[in-house]
């Protein structure tokens, strides 16, 4: 298989280095494009080689199996940058732009609407796909549209917020094989930057004081079964501190599973399934993960049921 040197492809790259849980096997081929043109060239090559392709951002909502991923894995975290108009409140950001960076830049420009996201360890692309949210806010509230790439054809197009069919931690992109390249947001202009700075600082303090930032995690593991909170249900059943291998239900926030230092992806998967089973037995509720599994897991169908 001929690999063009200008694609900067690497072989057998451990993917745990590119997820916030720090677990997962290797990718057959791996690349971090630094421009949209580079990404499109990678997709063109992968399509020509008939390789399965996976796309990741900051890796904060992913559980990659210990066996790794076949084919080509493309990480968008180097596709950074944003442009904003302080008059109209419109801001456009590349898929790999860290969400906290975008939130702080908007706040400094007097643009309100992303303060809730300052503590989320993800990228714009991942946030658009997952309809990320916190502190009562979410991506869908301010998104105008997203520019997406269809890997099967190499074509790009814009999808409006309505087309993305947003719901709680859901978008149409979770079931469509499309890749976010950039996104546009409409924020409230003309707000005092010092007021916005105070809001972002307050939101960040709330997250860092109640969530386990000192250990690798993926963020919230389960969606909240409205009107209840997943973390409260899990804590109420005495599962804080429960371990399987190196995976542990956080003693600080029960909707977080942390890597205590030597966890495998299989440990994370098993603990997720254990928590689901205990909650189901006690309350008759099925907790649905926010985290997306990639690769092969034992009993994966049971876990997703």
From Swiss-Prot:
Cofactor: FAD
Keyword terms: Cell cycle, Cell division, Cell shape, Cell wall biogenesis/degradation, Cytoplasm, FAD, Flavoprotein, NADP, Oxidoreductase, Peptidoglycan synthesis
Catalytic residues identified in the record: 169, 220 (proton donor), 290
Catalytic activities: UDP-N-acetyl-alpha-D-muramate + NADP(+) = UDP-N-acetyl-3-O-(1-carboxyvinyl)-alpha-D-glucosamine + NADPH + H(+)
Domain FAD-binding PCMH-type: 22-190
The keyword Cell wall biogenesis/degradation belongs to this UniProt entry's keyword annotation: yes
Enzyme nomenclature, EC number: 1.3.1.98
Enzyme class, broadest EC rank: oxidoreductase
Pathway per the UniProt entry: Cell wall biogenesis; peptidoglycan biosynthesis
GO function terms (MF aspect): FAD binding; UDP-N-acetylmuramate dehydrogenase activity
Statement: the UniProt record of this protein carries the keyword Membrane: no
Protein's GO biological process: cell division; cell wall organization; peptidoglycan biosynthetic process; regulation of cell shape
Main location: cytoplasm
Subcellular location, record wording: Cytoplasm
One GO CC term, this protein: cytosol
Superkingdom assignment: Bacteria
Function: Cell wall formation.
Family: Belongs to the MurB family.
The protein's name in its UniProt record: UDP-N-acetylenolpyruvoylglucosamine reductase
Species of provenance: Synechococcus sp. (strain RCC307)
Gene: murB
């Amino acid at each position: 298989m001929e690999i063009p040197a200008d694609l900067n492809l690497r072989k057998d790259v451990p993917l745990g280095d590119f997820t916030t849980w720090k677990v997962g096997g290797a990718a057959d081929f791996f690349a971090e494009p630094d421009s949209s043109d580079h990404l499109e060239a990678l997709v063109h090559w992968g399509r020509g080689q008939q390789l399965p392709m996976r796309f990741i951002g900051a890796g904060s909502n992913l559980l990659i199996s210990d066996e790794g991923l076949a084919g080509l894995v493309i990480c968008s975290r180097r596709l950074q940058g944003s442009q904003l108009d302080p008059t109209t409140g419109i801001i456009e950001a590349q898929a790999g732009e860290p969400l906290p960076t975008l939130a702080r830049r908007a706040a400094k420009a007097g643009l309100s609407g992303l303060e809730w996201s300052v503590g989320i360890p993800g990228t714009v692309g991942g946030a658009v796909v997952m309809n990320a949210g916190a502190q009562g806010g979410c991506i869908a509230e301010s998104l105008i549209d997203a520019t997406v790439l269809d890997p099967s054809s190499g074509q790009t197009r814009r999808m409006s917020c309505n087309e993305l069919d947003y719901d709680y931690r859901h978008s149409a992109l979770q079931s469509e094989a499309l890749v976010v390249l950039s996104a546009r947001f409409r924020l409230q202009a003309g707000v005092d930057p010092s007021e916005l700075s105070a809001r972002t600082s307050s939101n960040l303090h709330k997250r860092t004081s109640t969530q386990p930032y000192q250990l690798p995690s993926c963020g919230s593991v389960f969606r909240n079964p409205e009107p209840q909170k997943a973390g409260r249900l899990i804590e109420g059943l005495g599962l804080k501190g429960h371990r399987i291998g190196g995976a542990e239900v956080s003693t600080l926030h029960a909707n977080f599973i942390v890597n205590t230092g030597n966890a495998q992806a299989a440990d994370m998967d098993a603990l997720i399934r254990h928590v689901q089973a205990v909650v189901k037995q006690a309350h008759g509720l099925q907790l649905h993960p926010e985290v997306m599994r990639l690769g092969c897991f034992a009993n994966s169908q049971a876990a997703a049921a």
